[in-house]
Amino acid sequence: MPEERSPLQTIAVICVKLDQGEPEEKIREYLDIEDELFAFCVEFALENNLIIKQESGRYEITRYGKEFASVF
């Protein structure tokens, strides 16, 4: 059974791993999510201008240059 994540955690993990050069297929397998959900998460991040950085086990998310969220 996959680990429970919030929608923002899922988006953060996808974006950070893509930024690190990990292949989409590996990320989908790691998160155990369908192609459609993966595509939605990437599209959501792009459309909302989210910038996600991983720092000390947390994902810091900014939107339009302002703090948006911080998730584990």
Task: Give the location of each predicted region.
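Hydrophobic beta-strand residues in large extracellular and virion-surface proteins
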Residues: 14, 27, 51, 59-61
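Extended low-polarity, hydrophobic cluster-rich segments
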Residues: 11-12, 41, 68
